Amino acid sequence: MSPLDCAFTPSLPKTALVTGGAQRIGRVLCVALARAGFDVAVHFRHSQIEADQLVQELQQLGVRACAVQADLDDATSAEALLAQARAQLGVIGVLVNNASMFEYDALTQQAPLSVELFEQHWRANTFAPMLLTQQLAQQLPLEHTGVVVNLLDQKLCNPNPDFLSYTLSKAALAQGTVLAAQALAPRIRVMGIAPGLSLRSGEQSDADFAQKHNQTILQRGSTPEDLAHALLYILSAPSMTGTTLMVDGGQHLTASARDVMFLP
């Protein structure tokens, strides 16, 4: 069965907010949702041109779409995001927390920890997704159900010390996925998707990315399209909550002492 043929629960409003939706993985997720019949709010921070272009593309697929701006590193801006989406599309049934801050730091002299960078990761990668999850629940009428999907990382099961603040913020979001699933059941399901090497990491070259992409036990990493298929499966699987789908080609099963961008 094609992922686009999945049956969705009738009580689930077919409206979605995708953070970081204008580019890269988020863009693919938005297109997949639209093709499955969801109206889509495309969140962006700086990429307004890309967001507006994507909105036009989604509308051509026969759904409603809008672009909504927010800086998820700023609590006031993040707090207004879901209300913006709801004002244009109505009740939001699906929240995809895809946006992520990903800046390098480690417990080394070359890239030491700083309070500023640590807190930026925490606000963007942990607090904002949990705040939006709470807001989704608050605006959802009693007769409706909802789904939250958090984009995590396979390295939570296969840790290395690179990108320390990022990793800690994603680890907190993974635990938040479980806690939110417990708190918001039975009307709202909360799930995680943990990608592997899906796009170039940092300053990784295209050639190196292609090589590393084939070094998992399945000899392929995950593609943005794989993640979109996982998202649609979650939306169509009403018995799933509080767990994470590993969509990584088995990358989490092979120990790695460093981030993939530093490996030979």
For each of these PLM feature ranges, what is it?
Residues 22-24:
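Conserved glycine-rich cofactor-binding loop
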Residues 38-53:
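Conserved glycine-rich Rossmann-like NAD(P)H-binding loop of the short-chain dehydrogenase/reductase
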Residues 225-247, 252-253:
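C-terminal substrate-recognition "lid" of short-chain dehydrogenase/reductases
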Residues 33, 174, 184-198, 240-247:
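Conserved Rossmann-fold SDR core element
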Residues 12-14, 63-64, 91-92, 139-153, ...:
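Active-site loop of short-chain dehydrogenase/reductase
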Residues 101-102, 109, 113-117, 146-185, ...:
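Catalytic loop of short-chain dehydrogenase/reductase
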Residues 216-227:
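A conserved structural motif in NAD(P)-dependent oxidoreductases
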